[in-house]
């Protein structure tokens, strides 16, 4: 395993650990989730380029589309929670039920 793969895997693990540690605030969770998606995108792109997989060359773009949708939904949820309760604590998400 080359150093590039190890560094990207380490970035993913650090983002995952950040997700576990900073799970009380929604903004911190969204930033850690974006770090995870970025490391997955880079890992997928490097793997496809190194292995010359032409059939899977669209997969990083599909991952970016899903990451953009996730970011838009997460930010809209963050705005809704912060406007309603004045804070971005994740525990307030349970109170948004109808």
Curated annotation (Swiss-Prot):
Core subunit of the mitochondrial membrane respiratory chain NADH dehydrogenase (Complex I) which catalyzes electron transfer from NADH through the respiratory chain, using ubiquinone as an electron acceptor. Part of the enzyme membrane arm which is embedded in the lipid bilayer and involved in proton translocation. It is a multi-pass membrane protein. This is NADH-ubiquinone oxidoreductase chain 4L. InterPro entries: NADH_UbQ_OxRdtase_chain4L/K, NUOK/Mnh_C1-like. One of its GO terms (biological process) is ATP synthesis coupled electron transport. Its EC number is 7.1.1.2. PANTHER family: NADH-UBIQUINONE OXIDOREDUCTASE CHAIN 4L (PTHR11434:SF0), NADH-UBIQUINONE OXIDOREDUCTASE SUBUNIT ND4L (PTHR11434). GO terms for molecular function: NADH dehydrogenase (ubiquinone) activity. It comes from Vulpes vulpes.
């Amino acid at each position: 395993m080359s150093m590039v793969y190890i560094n990207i895997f380490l970035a993913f693990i650090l983002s995952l650990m950040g997700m576990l540690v900073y799970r009380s605030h929604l903004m911190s969770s969204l930033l850690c989730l974006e770090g995870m998606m970025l490391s997955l995108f880079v890992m997928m792109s490097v793997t496809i380029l190194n292995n010359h997989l032409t059939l899977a060359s669209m997969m990083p773009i599909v991952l970016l589309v899903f990451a953009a949708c996730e970011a838009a939904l997460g930010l809209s949820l963050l705005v809704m929670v912060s406007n309603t309760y004045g804070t971005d604590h994740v525990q307030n998400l349970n109170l948004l039920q109808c």
